[in-house]
């Protein structure tokens, strides 16, 4: 696949589940159709938002297969394959390739983080198992390691099949240093929804995030205008978008369940324990007010 397809606004797709916790193929198909209709540039599966680490290898394989089939090559698919063990991550990478995904991604070692060499040994095993473009997932909030941008960049560029990185951090200075060292050899996707326009100034070619499940069209519209020089569009939109995030992030899955049902007639189901919803009951008027806020703020 052409490297230039890895850009733009990608929802970190939610994984609809049935009451018994099994992924719901029908609702997944409906969500894929809705996101493509709304203009998603690609779909990122089975990450934190998609509850990937809480699903079995069998379930993750099925979700990947169903999504690839539903997308039918209309948008690229990136499957997150990070798991508790390197062996499981490698197996999931093979499954993603066999299912027809266009790229793979993975967080670093979950729970066990000895040093930077162990992190990149984990990545190396994943990247070498198939020929798909590989996008390691750097999640700054969960990393206990410190390293310089130069050290990180050198190890990143040495990985097999590396094409980019999902970089989830509020530190855009650090992101800019990474971009300055790696240039176009590493395509950076920002993972901080609340900074997706700001991240473009630090070298991000796109954004992958939870809130694009609801507002991919609006965010794509504003980002496109911003990149063409319409700074006022971003200045108007970003505070509204940040407000919407701030009042819903404490119960993100509960909010998404109500909002996606209202907007797309998609039921994502409940969360998988130990992940829980917070508020549980969102009034339609609350959600409608946020829909109106974002629509008005995104008008160019």
What feature does the model see in each segment?
Residues 24-27, 31, 59, 63, ...:
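General structural feature for long, well-ordered alpha-helical segments within catalytic domains
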Residues 128-129, 140-249:
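Catalytic alpha/beta core domains of metabolic enzymes, predominantly
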Residues 8-14, 34, 38-39, 204, ...:
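C-terminal alpha-helical cap/extension of soluble enzyme domains
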Residues 74-75, 133, 162, 185, ...:
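Secondary-structure boundary/capping positions in well-ordered alpha/beta enzyme cores
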Residues 1-3, 299-300:
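Basic/polar N-terminal segments that are highly enriched at the extreme N-terminus
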Residues 2-144, 154:
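Active-site beta->alpha loop and helix N-cap motifs at the rims of alpha/beta catalytic domains
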């Amino acid at each position: 696949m052409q490297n230039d397809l890895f850009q733009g606004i990608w929802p970190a797709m939610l994984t609809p589940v049935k009451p018994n916790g099994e992924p719901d193929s029908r609702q997944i198909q409906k969500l894929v159709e809705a996101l493509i209709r709304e203009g998603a540039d690609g779909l990122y599966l089975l990450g934190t938002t998609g509850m990937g680490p809480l699903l079995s290898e069998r379930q993750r394989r099925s979700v990947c297969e169903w999504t690839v089939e539903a997308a039918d090559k209309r948008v690229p698919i990136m499957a997150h394959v990070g798991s508790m063990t390197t062996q499981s991550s490698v197996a999931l990478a093979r499954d993603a390739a066999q299912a027809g995904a266009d790229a793979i991604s993975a967080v670093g070692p979950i729970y066990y983080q000895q040093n930077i060499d162990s992190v990149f040994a984990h990545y190396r095993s994943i990247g070498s198992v198939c020929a798909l473009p590989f996008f390691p997932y750097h999640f700054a909030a969960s990393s206990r390691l410190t390293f310089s941008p130069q050290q990180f960049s050198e190890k990143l560029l040495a990985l097999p099949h590396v094409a980019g990185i999902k970089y989830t951090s509020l530190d855009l200075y650090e992101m800019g240093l990474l971009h300055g060292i790696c240039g176009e050899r590493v395509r950076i996707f920002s993972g901080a929804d609340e900074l997706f326009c700001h991240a473009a100034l630090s070298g991000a070619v796109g954004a992958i995030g939870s809130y694009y499940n609801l507002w991919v069209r609006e965010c794509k519209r504003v980002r496109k205008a911003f990149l063409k020089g319409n700074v006022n569009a971003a200045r108007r939109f970003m505070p509204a978008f940040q407000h919407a995030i701030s009042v819903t992030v404490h119960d993100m899955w509960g909010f998404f369940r109500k909002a996606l049902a209202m907007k797309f007639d998609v039921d994502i189901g409940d969360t998988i324990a130990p992940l829980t919803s917070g508020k549980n009951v969102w009034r339609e008027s609350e959600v409608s007010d946020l829909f109106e806020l974002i629509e008005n703020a995104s008008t160019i």
